[in-house]
Amino acid sequence: MTRYLPLALLLPVAFASAPQQPQPRSRSAAIADRGLTPADFPKLQKIADRVYVFSDLHSGGFGYLTNDLIVVTDAGVLVADGQGTPAVTQKLVDEIRRLTPQPIVNVVVCSEHGDHTGGNVSFPSSAVFFSSPASQAALQAQAANDRPGGSRTIVPAETVASSRTIRLGTTEIDIVYNGRAHTSGDLEVSLPAEKILFASEVFTNHIFPSMRTAYPSEWIATLERVAAIDAAMIVPGHGFVEDPATMQAEFVAFRHAMGTVVAEGIRLHGLNLPASDAVAQARWGEYVRWTGSERNAPIAIQRVFDELDGKLK
């Protein structure tokens, strides 16, 4: 049952413009570190009138949460991001049916990665899917390689290259592209009246930056633009969703983490060592205690090296 709960030139700019980072706290994105178990999920949280966040365990077994935004209106429901499997996404769909008789009319693919799109086949076939052009192309390529009998990849019919405003009844919803970050086509969803921003994988709560397909210095610039959006509540793509003040503080902390990781990658690149050797000399400070650091740190260093070497296109 669902549980309810009421690069080098950029770095000085990033650190200077980010608000002062709060003092380090004993926090974690891992559910086990908070005394929770898989039986405590999925979870639905109401964050504003007719606005909810659905959270369930990451489909990769990493022990932290994947989050989706649900916006209920008199003209239908908009969902931002899905879950990693058809079964878990069906739980999301079923939860929406318990919330409202209104149909799911729009699904926004903010992240093209499988942990957010792997279950999209469970959404109603009548729903209109949106993504960035880059994510649409990535999902088209993936769909071409779908295996018989496997889950079908849904390719969005609509694309958002810069921004698009959707009006469902009296609710205004902005879909925005602020630049490459965790992927080549990250989107964010903003509710201007409610001052809510769903940042998807551009922001993860207390998880060491995951850069497998990222654009490190561009991610820092994208975070700067996202920070300029007038939002009291910022919802991450992964990690716990807490009160607005805590989420603001965690967003600031994540921006500092990104700056630190990229700066350390630049320093290590200057040692003229292979990335696989350089990572052993990394100085992460408090971020070594962030969830996923052991897995994500070597990937981040390699990705920064690739960017500095001109290998990212």
What is the meaning of each model-derived region?
Residues 8-18:
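Hydrophobic h-region of N-terminal signal peptides that target proteins for export
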Residues 94-167:
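Active-site HxH/HxHxD metal-binding segment of metal-dependent hydrolases
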Residues 190, 218-273, 277:
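Divalent-metal (often Zn2+) His-rich catalytic cores of metallo-beta-lactamase-fold enzymes
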Residues 270-313:
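C-terminal regulatory/interaction regions
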Residues 80-82, 105-113, 130-133, 178, ...:
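Active-site neighborhood of phospho(di)ester-bond hydrolases with catalytic His/Asp-centered motifs
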Residues 41, 46-47, 135-179, 183-185, ...:
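Metallo-beta-lactamase
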Residues 45-95, 187-201:
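Conserved beta-strand hairpin/beta-sheet module of binuclear metal-dependent hydrolase folds
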Residues 20-42:
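N-terminal pre-domain segments of enzymes
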